[in-house]
Curated annotation (Swiss-Prot):
Biological role stated in the UniProt entry: Catalyzes the reversible adenylation of nicotinate mononucleotide (NaMN) to nicotinic acid adenine dinucleotide (NaAD).
EC number: 2.7.7.18
Name of this protein: Probable nicotinate-nucleotide adenylyltransferase
NCBIfam families for this protein: cyt_tran_rel (TIGR00125), nicotinate (nicotinamide) nucleotide adenylyltransferase (TIGR00482), PRK00071.1-1 (NF000839), PRK00071.1-3 (NF000840)
Species the sequence originates in: Pseudomonas aeruginosa (strain ATCC 15692 / DSM 22644 / CIP 104116 / JCM 14847 / LMG 12228 / 1C / PRS 101 / PAO1)
Length: 214
């Protein structure tokens, strides 16, 4: 039996309990051997002022420390060129055994935007796609995805077979926490305790991150 590896990408600016709860639920539901949180690279002009990619990575490392099955994959931040998901998948897949299963977790909104992604039709050559559905999400996928869904979608998440190639949907009731809200609270000098893991809070406070400029 091959290993079951999940990839969960995000800007994690900062990583918060909503991300962590989704990660733990997915690792359990899909019986993953490992779920890698994958901080996404951004052009320097899109980074939050005063918070570097290295600091976003450091927060994720602290969030997953000691959490069974959760790890960090920093490869997108270590590239010196634009970071496309297909490049990441090819690079991860090249390190795995042929029978290892790779699951890429993405949100509904990201999934609906899939046809705009670089070489999007090749994504399923390397992984299964698990779409996290929210109860409040618009439930009709765009026209451009209908054929793909008809050919590749599997109703039962437990029925995904082989190293990749299929799409399934998982319902999650996400915690009402957002990175935008957390940045706003910190900018206003307010507490974000219990919205981020304690180790992340300690790092934010030690490095004075997300503070309003004085």
């Amino acid at each position: 039996m091959g290993k079951r590896i999940g990839l969960f990408g995000g800007t994690f600016d900062p990583v918060h309990i909503g991300h962590m709860r989704s990660a733990v639920e997915m690792a359990e539901q899909f019986a993953l051997d490992e779920l890698r949180l994958l901080p996404n690279a951004r052009p320097p002009h899109r980074e939050t002022p005063q918070v570097s990619a290295a600091q976003r990575l450091a927060m994720v490392e602290r969030a997953v420390a000691g959490v069974e099955r959760l790890t960090v994959d920093p490869r997108e931040l270590q590239r010196d060129k634009p970071s496309y998901t297909i490049d990441t998948l090819e690079s991860v897949r090249a390190e795995l055994a042929a029978d290892d299963q790779l699951f890429m977790l993405i949100g509904w909104d990201a999934f609906c935007g899939l046809p705009t992604w670089h070489r999007w039709e090749a994504l399923l050559d390397h992984c299964h796609i698990v779409v996290l559905q929210r109860p409040d999400a618009d439930s009709e996928p765009p026209e451009s995805l209908r054929d793909l869904l008809a050919a590749r979608s599997v109703a039962d998440p437990q029925a995904l077979k082989g190293p990749g190639g299929q799409i399934t949907f998982v319902w999650q009731t996400p915690l009402a926490v957002s990175a935008t809200q957390i940045r706003a609270l910190l900018g206003a000098g307010r507490s974000v305790r219990f919205l981020v893991p304690d180790a992340v809070l300690n790092y934010i406070e030690a490095h004075h991150l997300y503070r309003a400029p004085h």
